[in-house]
């Protein structure tokens, strides 16, 4: 069985059950009102994982924070290797681009978005770890779907956005860890059931509306990029509230 847990609840859950596998996808500015900075969130997550030391951590290798500290748990990494190397820096307003070893600004050979990509530190040699599961080609992507190649197999999803391709890559990495056949992985990724606010489509009169929930600045940028892939014109409505965290907003 698989379960999605809030960032700080791993410490509570591992008191009662011993997971076999943790999956770490990313840490962005989702819930600063509850947990503080991204490094505080990461510390809380790792405390929970350490309580189940035999469980493997399957990490997004493109995220520098997941390679910043040693762990008692064995680790495996997934990530993108779909573009030729090109020296670059992340946007100046990007979080998490200081080397966790020496505080020098990280450089990149490839960036997918935000601070995710093939990073390295020119000062101390800190760099992205070797990837165990790799996305090697983006075949096609628009605002409603994407096709891509992971470890030599082509897969597709019926939702748009690079962030959803990352989710599919994480799911594929889990499936490969448990030796699930590619055909079954393909069928699972192709399953199309929209949930509330996650590119959910509803009818309003004779118009079709797509709802997209945004919870942090990186997510907002990604949704804007995704909308820019639409091959048609559309109207955009943005709804904003100033309530507290999940469950009230």
Q: What does each of the following model-derived ranges do?
A:
Residues 16-18, 48-53, 70-72, 230-232, ...:
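Short, conserved loop/helix-junction motifs that constitute active-site signature segments
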Residues 32-40, 247-248:
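Glycine/threonine-rich flexible loop motifs
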Residues 140-143, 175-214:
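Gly/charged, well-structured mid-domain segments that form the phosphate/adenylate-handling core
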């Amino acid at each position: 069985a698989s379960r999605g847990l809030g960032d700080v609840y791993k410490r509570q859950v591992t008191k009662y059950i011993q997971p076999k596998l943790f999956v770490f996808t990313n840490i962005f500015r989702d819930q600063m009102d509850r947990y503080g900075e991204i490094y505080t969130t990461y510390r809380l997550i790792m405390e929970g994982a350490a309580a189940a030391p035999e469980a493997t951590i399957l990490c997004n290798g493109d995220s520098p924070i997941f390679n910043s500290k040693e762990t008692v748990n064995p680790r495996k990494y997934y990530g993108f290797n779909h573009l030729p190397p090109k020296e670059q820096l992340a946007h100046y307003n990007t979080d998490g681009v200081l080397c966790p070893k020496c505080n020098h600004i990280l450089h990149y050979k490839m960036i997918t978005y935000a601070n995710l990509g093939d990073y390295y530190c020119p000062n101390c040699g800190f760099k992205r770890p070797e990837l165990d599961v790799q996305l090697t080609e983006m075949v096609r992507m628009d605002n409603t779907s994407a096709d891509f190649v992971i470890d030599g197999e082509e897969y597709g999803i019926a939702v748009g956005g690079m962030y959803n391709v990352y989710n599919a890559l994480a799911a594929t990495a889990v499936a490969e860890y448990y030796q699930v056949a590619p055909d079954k992985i393909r069928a699972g990724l192709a399953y199309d059931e929209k949930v509330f606010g996650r590119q959910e489509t509803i009818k309003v009169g004779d118009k079709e509306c797509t709802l997209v929930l945004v919870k942090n600045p990186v997510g907002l940028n990604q949704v804007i990029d995704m909308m820019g892939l639409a091959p048609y014109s559309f109207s955009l409505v943005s709804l904003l509230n100033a309530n507290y965290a999940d469950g009230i907003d």
